[in-house]
Regions:
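Single conserved hydrophobic/aromatic residue that forms the stacking wall/gate
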Residues: 136-146
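GST-like domain detector, emphasizing the conserved glutathione-binding G-site
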Residues: 1-138
């Protein structure tokens, strides 16, 4: 990227106005919820809040694979978070994921609820929790093949 020679980055970045179309506000440079909204809670220990985007689908696939492998304690409830409507900025969702991004997982299977967010972190968390070979590192995969 080329900047003018006299360009000096500001000491404090300020968001002056929205630009970028419909989804510009989904990556806003401020934190916290914009409105109060309770999230639904189902009957299973795992509550997945997501949408059918590539990152959102990854966790659903992981849960389904765990169930197919016989991990019946991997039952989960999946709830739609419509990022087009800004539902990721609701108070309960932000309490689970302060980054206001999908997917977000609430694990109620232990004594205390655990919140896990970011698709990669959720996948690793589930792989470790269920001692699953689905996400072995290359060293672990090599060991598994021996």
């Amino acid at each position: 990227m080329n900047y003018p020679i006299d360009y000096v980055p500001p000491k404090i970045w300020k968001w002056e106005n929205e630009n970028g179309g419909t989804f510009a506000s989904t990556n806003r440079p401020i934190a916290g919820s914009t409105h109060d909204k309770a999230l639904p809670i189902g009957q299973h220990p795992f509550q997945l809040y997501s949408q059918g985007t590539p990152n959102g689908i990854k966790v659903t696939v992981m849960f389904e694979e765990l169930l197919e492998m016989g991990h019946s304690d991997a039952e989960y409830d999946a709830w739609l978070i419509s990022i087009g409507k800004g539902e990721q900025f609701g108070s309960d969702f932000v309490n689970i994921n302060p980054n206001s991004k999908i997917p977000a997982l609430l694990d109620n299977s232990g004594d205390e609820p655990k919140r896990v967010f970011e698709s990669g972190a959720i996948l690793l968390y589930l792989a470790e929790k269920f001692n699953s070979c689905l996400l072995y590192t290359s060293d672990a995969a090599d060991e598994e093949l021996r």
